[in-house]
Amino acid sequence: MNLFFNHTTRSADRWLTGIVLLLSFFGVLMVYDASVAIAIRDFGNQYYYAREQLKWLGIGILAMIMLSRIDYHMWHRFVLPAILGVMVLLVAVFIPGFGVRALGANRWLNFGVFILQPAEAAKLVLILYLAAWLSVKEKKRLGAFLLLTGSIFSLVMLEPDLGTAVIIAGTALVMYFLSGAPMKHFAFLLPLIIAGVVILAVSSPYRFRRLTTYVNPDSDPLGASYQIRQVLISLGSGGLTGIGIGKSRQKYEYLPEANTDSIFAIIGEETGFVGTTFITGAFAFFVWRAFWIAARANDTFGKLLASGVASWVGIQSILNMGAMSALVPLTGIPLPFISYGGSSLVILLAASGIVLNISRQQKL
């Protein structure tokens, strides 16, 4: 067991630890605030969602502490069974009685005592696998990279979950080019990516409606445009400093997904431009600090691993906040560390723990 733990006396990066805990505990507060109405409606207990989020936060913090002390090099030997295992789980969501279907998608697995969203685990596992593989593979890797990333992307798209698929693909591409891939590969991939996004957008009636509501939010105010209109009402109501914590009107079932995908809009309503700027800055700081740790890692594996986590959190937060600001189409993805959801929170905290272990072993 001692082989798994590094014995450096250097402490983990305090700045990254602080920003992760700040975002996570603020998330519990906002989950409680945003979910009061639906918690009473569905469970007769206004604290239900906050209590669940706090439970998962406790588990996540324990995972973060443990993984911050486990030598990150140990993960190198487990990446192959991990990637195969997560692909099996992504297929298992379609098994009747085991997979859970909700809101028109098969995204969850029911293990009895808890429900897991395999696509969240796939983000971290793919980062681990790519960091290990790209740190040793030097030539003829584009085809294999596209096959692996494309397989994970396709399995997530079958659920369907375009938002998570885009995060996975974007994170993988950043890691690929940070590993030293030639720019001619970028020139080859860019038109394929653009064409793929266009095809995915127009091939599904649901996604096409979301795209048209992005272009024209007034096109269907009581239907496809309803959520984005309520989001903009929330943000507009907040003004400069907000109407006050706990005073949101939109959380009373006017705004869909108020405690999950749309929680940034509740933050904007209650804390205004000042609050949303602070949260945006907090995510920017996390991304910068994780890349800072990556730049000082002792080896390529550590550099790519920390860079992958930084890219994941950066892409996901940009997509969520961009969608809530009507800068990009709605994608249905949670705000990292803040939105309600056990799988997302625990896995993000676990990933942060791995980055913290890299910081414990970084160059002075």
What are the language-model segments listed below?
Residues 1-4, 320-364:
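A juxtamembrane structural motif centered on a specific transmembrane helix
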Residues 1-20:
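N-terminal membrane topogenic signal
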Residues 17-25, 29-33, 40-227, 265-326, ...:
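Hydrophobic alpha-helical transmembrane segments of multi-pass inner membrane proteins, especially
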Residues 24, 33-36, 248, 339, ...:
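Short linear Ser/Thr-Pro motifs
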Residues 35, 235, 239, 325:
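Short, small-residue-rich loop/turn micro-motifs
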Residues 112-122, 158-160, 239-244, 333-347:
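Glycine/serine-rich anion-binding loops at beta->alpha junctions
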Residues 164, 260, 331:
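Ser/Thr-centric signal marking residues that sit
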Residues 213, 217-260, 264, 271-275:
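TM-adjacent membrane-interface loops and short helices in multi-pass inner/ER membrane proteins
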